[in-house]
Amino acid sequence: MNEKLPISIAQITDIHLLASESQRLQGISTTESFLAVMKRLEELRPELDLLLMTGDLSDDGTPESYENLQHYLNSLQIATYWLPGNHDCAIAMDKILNLGMVSRRKSFQRGNWNFILLNSSVTDCVYGYLSATTLDWLDSELKMLPNNPTLIALHHPPLSVNSAWIDRSCLQNSQELFAVIDRYPQVKLVLFGHIHQEFRRQRHNVHYLGSPSTCYQFQSQSTTFAINQELPGFRLLKLYADGTWTTKIERVPYSLPIEPTVTVSY
């Protein structure tokens, strides 16, 4: 048993909000599915220290979608940090998602842990890529921050998820990211979104965790685009001062059916 209380974190990802709350995506209301997740987060609020949002918070990148998101988050009153995904507009996010408990900071500390959030999005592209500037910044942050357990987050998976159509849009320069991470043994976890499903793999001593979407879920290990009937979800983590951690996936009730005929949307 650890002597110090852990940091309790919720990771939510791939919300895909739209400018109009009445719009639907893949047959469901992404607003309604997100509010179902928010209801569960409200129940968990007394035990949560931090909310991490790992990209594709909007589907259309509109200011209206981010204004709606900021409104919902205001009521939650949990320290919240975010990073952009391929559907997002980082400029609009920077302007809007930085009020109250919502922060646009990309490097911070909580408890005995360091947190570093990376922008892997590329304008008008589905795949991810970390610029040389971003990689240099990551390296400098890891040098400068205390030698404490560290969590890194980005939107795109740096590892294959064994689903051919998703793997084509993963992080395109993963080896450059690994080259930085491998120099710093304090890095314990890398969180990401984009894949709309649970994923867990270890590379060296670092664990890479992907999480379900708050809306529709992709069929795992599918060669082509496919959606399954799994419920909206998010990830919960407890981070202990000694660098150990635990995690689980939470699913929330959502009754509206997904349309059988859909179009590809990461």
UniProtKB/Swiss-Prot annotation:
Binding site for Fe cation 1: D14, H16, D56, H196
Keyword Iron attached: yes
Coiled coil region boundaries: none
Cofactors that this protein relies on: Fe(2+); Mn(2+)
Any Pfam family hit: Metallophos
UniProtKB keywords: cAMP, cGMP, Hydrolase, Iron, Metal-binding, Nucleotide-binding
Family, similarity comment: Belongs to the cyclic nucleotide phosphodiesterase class-III family.
Name of this chain's protein: 3',5'-cyclic-nucleotide phosphodiesterase alr5338
Species this protein is from: Nostoc sp. (strain PCC 7120 / SAG 25.82 / UTEX 2576)
